């Protein structure tokens, strides 16, 4: 048996299905691993009496964890991981829909807020990359969002940065007004 990401797997299951981490992907390699597991697992069990011990370290200088590392290519790794998972989950709509929702949520809640912080050069590079991820999402997923969020996502699929900025600012103003009253 092998422990991966806090879960015990039979080694035979992982080797028979050729499930392993993508060594070339420094960040976000676990979603691809889990997608492969979900595509191949037939049944699973749970032992509620188990104890999981995790070592937590917070040394940003000598031994930083991956989440503490600063890297300009994290967005590129995120998009690549998303695209790999979408390819793997083509035959299972529930998994694919989950990834589409995660991508849209990330774009609306995290990425669209970056327009207030970054320089113009960085924005245009990240914008094309992140918008290509949203373009992979289905219209059914996008239709589940509110009016302003739909506008942000629709303009992202059209690669219209100015309109995404406009609607992101409207969303931000709307949220701030709600918090004030």
Task: Describe the residue ranges of each PLM region.
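Conserved nucleotide-sugar donor-binding catalytic segment
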Residues: 1-70
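Structural motif
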Residues: 92-102
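Gram-positive cell-envelope targeting signals
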Residues: 33, 41, 46-47, 61-69, ...
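Amphipathic alpha-helical repeat scaffolds of TPR domains
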Residues: 100-113
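Membrane-interface aromatic/basic loop that binds lipid-linked glycans or pyrophosphate carriers
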Residues: 116-181
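Catalytic core of nucleotide-sugar-dependent glycosyltransferases
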Residues: 49-58, 64-94, 110, 117-141
